[in-house]
Amino acid sequence: MVTKRGRKFLNTPGPTHVPDRVMNAMHQPTLDLSDPDFLDVSMSCFLDMRKVFNTEGEIFLYSSNGHGAWEASLVNVFSPGDKILVPETGNFSNAWASMAKALKLEVETLPGNWRRAIDIEALEEHLKKDTKKEIKGVLIIHTETATGITNDLPAIRSAIDSANHPGLLIVDTVAAAGTAVSYTHLR
């Protein structure tokens, strides 16, 4: 006997229900790269993403899942042996740290409570202790999908600045993109 459990629907990180109009739009045939409309659609994506992130800065689209974007950011920004800091906020921060280790990066973690956002004071103190400025990057998960914890990006940016630390702030915003009021603090 087959049990029907109601309407099937796609869940994206969050999970978030996808409206029917979006699902219907996904039923359109894929444009070929040589299609004259492809450039218009692509440019629309770039321009519209600027609105989402409230920026005039350059937008880069990367076709992969979040883990693919992690790997791309790690191998294109850092070199083997570089030191990075990954504050622990849940499964995704730990997975990103594990990937970085596999790519031969030196990973420092800032222990955290999976039920709370990053301890901003602890982050700032950790960076202040890096007097030789060896930490090349600070990797943050904006929203941990499983726990729903959302980290305060403006406060994190302020902590890095207050510590007078040059480490590059890299943010995984897969589960939060489009939900934050503004991303201007990342400039």
What are these regions (language model features)?
Residues 7-63, 67:
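A glycine-/small-polar-enriched, mobile loop at the entrance of the PLP active site in fold-type I
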Residues 118-177:
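Active-site phosphate-binding strand-loop segment of PLP-dependent enzymes
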Residues 111-116:
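Short beta->alpha junction loops
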Residues 95-106:
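Active-site-proximal loop->helix
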Residues 1-5:
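Basic/polar N-terminal segments that are highly enriched at the extreme N-terminus
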Residues 184-185:
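Conserved small/polar residues in nucleotide/adenosyl-binding loops
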Residues 56-85, 89-97:
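Conserved beta-loop-alpha segment that forms the PLP phosphate-binding cup at the N-terminus of a helix
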Residues 10-12, 60-63, 86, 109-110, ...:
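General beta-strand structural signal in soluble alpha/beta enzymes
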